[in-house]
Regions:
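The feature marks proteins involved in alpha-glucan
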Residues: 1-18, 26-32, 36
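Conserved, mostly hydrophobic/aromatic
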Residues: 19, 48, 58, 96, ...
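Aromatic- and acidic-residue-enriched carbohydrate-binding clefts of CAZyme catalytic domains
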Residues: 30-37, 68-122, 133-155
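Surface-exposed amphipathic alpha-helices with a cationic face
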Residues: 46-49, 114-123, 168-176
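Active-site-proximal helices and loops of the catalytic beta/alpha 8
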Residues: 91, 145, 151-193
Length: 193
């Protein structure tokens, strides 16, 4: 990690910029290979610095299905019916322990995401990951997901959404005690006091 330890931007000082990895970088004058990728986001850092941004929130950027299968009422699924609807946003269960490979300019999603985080931190910008946990998720899996992204990828915080967020379990653990946690309806400053 070349000395990277993450950033601790106080809530009251945070100037947060929320982006969708694919959607945000498609419009910019980037090399075609970098459009819609973590590498492409890395090229936006000087612009964010000019705006005074000190934290970037990534909408779901973990591995998730892009094509949603259609539910069949009766009968068998056929090849024709496999197309489904495109899931652009990622607000669904996924493979929570992996960066979205479709958001990579390289064939190494882990390395590309780590390089992006290091660039952000060198520029003084924190990374907040938005994670969606549905009601049916095991709370321990959700907790381990957050711990993993903090330890392995040096993510600075999380915006948690969905009915399956185990806030009590998350708040009891010490590993996330110095991590930014945002959750609708919870005043995080008072939650720890």
């Amino acid at each position: 990690w070349e000395g990277d330890d993450g950033l601790d931007v106080p809530y009251q000082d945070m100037i947060l910029y929320k982006v969708h990895v694919r959607g945000y970088t498609k419009q910019y004058k980037l090399p075609a290979k970098e459009k819609g990728t973590f590498a492409g986001l890395g090229e936006m850092i000087p612009y964010w610095k000019d705006l005074g941004i000190n934290a970037v929130e990534l909408m779901p950027a973990y591995e998730f299905f892009e094509i949603l299968p259609e539910e069949e009422k009766t009968g068998m699924v056929t090849e024709k019916r496999r197309e489904g609807k495109v899931n652009f946003w990622g607000y669904m269960p996924g493979y929570y322990f992996a960066p979205k490979s479709a958001y990579c300019a390289t064939d190494n999603p882990q390395r590309e995401f780590c390089d992006f985080i290091k660039k952000l931190h060198k520029a003084g910008i924190a990374c907040i990951m938005e994670m969606y946990f549905p009601a049916e998720i095991n709370g321990v899996i959700a907790l381990r997901t957050l711990q993993f992204w903090k330890l392995y990828y040096h993510v600075d915080g999380f915006h948690l959404s969905g009915e399956g967020v185990p806030m009590k379990l998350i708040l009891r653990g010490k590993l996330l005690a110095d991590t930014k946690l945002m959750f609708p309806g919870v005043d995080m400053d008072s939650a720890f006091h």
